[in-house]
Amino acid sequence: MSKLPMDADILPPSDDRIFKVLLTHPDAKRVLIDIISVVIDQNVIDVKIRGNEVPVMDIDEKNERFDVNCTIDSGDQVDVEMHSCRQAEIGSEHTNFINKYVYFLTDLHSSQKSKKVIYRNLVKTYQITFCMYNILPSTADFVNRFSLRTENNLQLTDQINIIIIELGKLNKALKKPVEELTSFEKWSLFLRYAQEPMQRKLINDIIKCKEEIGMAAALLQEISQDEHERARIRSRKMYEMDQYSNLHTSELRGEAKGREKGRGEIIKLLEKGYSLEEIKKMLEIN
């Protein structure tokens, strides 16, 4: 088993770019098979990755393109991805994330060859997303599975399947003895904490009891020594920070313009003889 050195500077497998590089490594087939088997709860024998490479300069579409699209021995389609950066949302319902998620899942399912194929013979499609931030705040479970069901929980079909793994909800797993962890919990802890020196002992204990995670750890060490990958991560982080900074600046400018406009409206109403109480009601000011 390849333990991670206690002082090693390990790149985070929770970074969407590193996640894809790890799972598509020529020596990572057993790793990918085991992750898919654990997540969809099936004994997967073989997996074939389908090409969906990201253009070198296509940084802006990373959340849509840094996925691992593959088929398994049953013929079913599986798309695996990592979301490391929170998407911009209006409100707290993550509607943008979920709608995009459903859009690409149904697009993948409908991409099957249907000519001269009986609909009952269409294969299943799985969308698996590991996420570094919480999408479903109403549940404490870190794994949530979705398919088409009625409001009474009667399943219509298992043709399309959504599985969301929220890596920010692993507190219970962190408190368990390693020997009591499920394979799903072990993989999730590895993907979330492999890069953190404070959790290195835990990760190495997990590596000792699961061979495929040991293989992933060895590959992750190899990837972490690649200066090209480190440069790409630095470049992407700078880009993301610039994006956040520009967004924050735009928000501040918008707030300033809003305050200026509000003051102008109040002055006009005062000039027309309205009282402050009347103005508060008109402008819905508390």
What kind of feature is each model-predicted range?
Residues 1-286:
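Elongated, amphipathic alpha-helical interaction scaffolds
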